[in-house]
Amino acid sequence: MESLASLYKNHIATLQERTRDALARFKLDALLIHSGELFNVFLDDHPYPFKVNPQFKAWVPVTQVPNCWLLVDGVNKPKLWFYLPVDYWHNVEPLPNSFWTEDVEVIALPKADGIGSLLPAARGNIGYIGPVPERALQLGIEASNINPKGVIDYLHYYRSFKTEYELACMREAQKMAVNGHRAAEEAFRSGMSEFDINIAYLTATGHRDTDVPYSNIVALNEHAAVLHYTKLDHQAPEEMRSFLLDAGAEYNGYAADLTRTWSAKSDNDYAQLVKDVNDEQLALIATMKAGVSYVDYHIQFHQRIAKLLRKHQIITDMSEEAMVENDLTGPFMPHGIGHPLGLQVHDVAGFMQDDSGTHLAAPAKYPYLRCTRILQPGMVLTIEPGIYFIESLLAPWREGQFSKHFNWQKIEALKPFGGIRIEDNVVIHENSVENMTRDLKLA
């Protein structure tokens, strides 16, 4: 494999080209990109965990250091002021010396408020991208040039097309997450609580709770019916029935986002349903290709859900077509088939149809779908179908003309298992689709 250093060199060249184009289009001289700042908890002197500006970590794999600044103009070597205070209270990261520092000019910034004297004197035509607009105003940036929508839309649109460096980082994040999923399954099989399973996951991935790209969803039994369950019970349930794990990892700022579901027993209806959802997920991925709308794949999976509901006699005496047409599949899969993935877990530009930011909303029937793009080479997306047994979504169907088609006895028997979700991360190539997750043999 080509070295990360050479891939990064090409990555920077791509970002420089995008920056030149954006600056020319919006008549700016340069962009000042801020890593961000620490913010204290209200009425406290303790800060919230630091989360870096994603537009900053697109350029440099510096994810844990606030008060850093990048100046980029698309022509000259990017200039990074790296926060390096004299501080005996807190850990201070050393000045970087890594595979990427040949391609960026790295300068120590000993005081957070010292950046003003180091920037070009003429700042009226510099754009600021960052989370602290008041800091930009203090530096003399024009208010109209603070997080300018046109520039951000342009950069966001092209972030959809990953460079080879970005794909290499995402494959490394996959490896970490796969290690975590294997450790978590083992912890589940040994009877651990959600809290302890989460610890096993973090240990295997080498992450802290604040390092993972999103809060791990570690859901035993009926908790799997809560789509974003993050409570983490300390006590294991008396009976282990099911385990849904939605958990990722991060490498150089790039995310993995995987989900697996396991049945405690291999010989019940739920275990067969898990297997069937997994098979249908793989079958859908096998059909994916560039040039097709992501929305089409979402709709196609509702047809596959209908097939499973019929096979398992959860819905009876109704055709699969009628199930989808009348949205009987909706309460069983209330979320979208997936989303773009990259520097952010729910990566940007899922609805953008061009580099001017033209927005195409999700279909009214499927409002929680997070992407309406035509798939193109370089895109990375999740494919994460599920079937759930959520009473608040099923309740409206207990009355009315379609109620008789629901096998309520079967649904009640499956509700204690919560639900099922299977999620892989795929890369769209010109003539193929790469499944980064399955390539690592995660069943």
UniProtKB/Swiss-Prot annotation:
One of its GO terms (biological process) is proteolysis. One of its GO terms (cellular component) is cytosol. Its EC number is 3.4.13.9. Keywords: Dipeptidase, Hydrolase, Manganese, Metal-binding, Metalloprotease, Protease. Mn(2+) 2 binds at residues 246, 257, 423. Binds 2 manganese ions per subunit. It holds the Pfam family Peptidase_M24. This is Xaa-Pro dipeptidase. It comes from Escherichia coli O7:K1 (strain IAI39 / ExPEC). The gene is pepQ.
